[in-house]
A protein has these predicted regions:
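Blade-loop segments of beta-propeller domains
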Residues: 1-3
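Right-handed parallel beta-helix
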Residues: 6-21, 37-50, 66-82, 101-118, ...
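Structural detector of coil-to-beta-strand junctions
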Residues: 23-24, 29-31, 52-55, 90, ...
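Long, acidic/serine-threonine-rich intrinsically disordered regions with weak helical/coil propensity
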Residues: 29, 42-45, 49, 53-59
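Active-site cleft segment of glycoside hydrolase catalytic domains centered on the general acid/base Glu
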Residues: 32, 58-64, 94
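Active-site beta-loop-alpha junctions enriched in small/polar residues
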Residues: 61, 94-96, 127, 148
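Glycine-rich phosphate-binding "P-loop"
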Residues: 89-100, 116-120
Length: 184
């Protein structure tokens, strides 16, 4: 298996990834990395990541990974302790170098429970993504359109905690986003 390989039309479903950390907290690791097109992560239980690096990352390097139409749906993302600083998102879509690339990734019907890795629970750095009907429960951070444009953020629920001042919501950067029917 090469780091340059891509996967198309693959699915990770009904799986558990729990406390699968490297021994050194500052070593970067990724629990789920998407490259290619039309891949899915659904009905999984993912919790306990404490290392540097996003839990799930969508990689758009190369023409074979843009317009990817990936789906991240119906998952439980469990507690992630604060890392301190960046590079601890629960979900990262793209990066600064691919911020103008179209992704068309759907993130829907997920439960984010105490996802406190950093200030961005979801970091969207690509175009044309949809975030629908997710629940963010006592998670210290926000859904952020960090780079990129034309995202739909609809029907999400953000449940805070009066004991934390770090609870976020939605932070918009870019053009053409539609934000509708969200509850805070």
């Amino acid at each position: 298996i090469s780091q340059d390989s891509v996967a198309n039309h693959c699915k990770i479903t009904n799986s558990v990834i729990l406390d699968f950390n490297k021994s050194q907290r500052n070593e970067t690791d990724l629990w789920v990395l998407f490259k290619g097109r039309h891949n899915e992560l659904d009905h999984c239980y993912i919790a306990g990541k404490s290392n540097r690096g996003p839990t799930v990352r969508i990689d758009l390097a190369g023409n074979n990974s843009i317009k990817n139409y990936h789906k991240i749906t119906n998952n439980y993302f469990g507690p992630r302790p604060p890392k301190g600083g960046p590079s601890a998102e629960t979900i990262q879509l793209g990066n600064s170098f691919t911020s103008m690339a179209p992704s068309y990734t759907l993130v829907a019907n997920n439960f984010f429970d105490h996802c406190n890795g950093e200030v961005e629970i979801i970091s969207s750095k690509t175009n044309f993504n949809e975030f629908r009907n997710n629940v963010f429960y006592k998670s210290e951070g926000s859904l952020v359109t960090r780079h990129g444009n034309y995202c739909i953020i609809d029907g999400n629920v953000f449940i805070g905690d009066e004991n934390s001042e770090q609870i976020g919501g939605i932070r918009l950067i870019g053009t053409g986003h539609w934000v509708t029917n969200n509850y805070f």
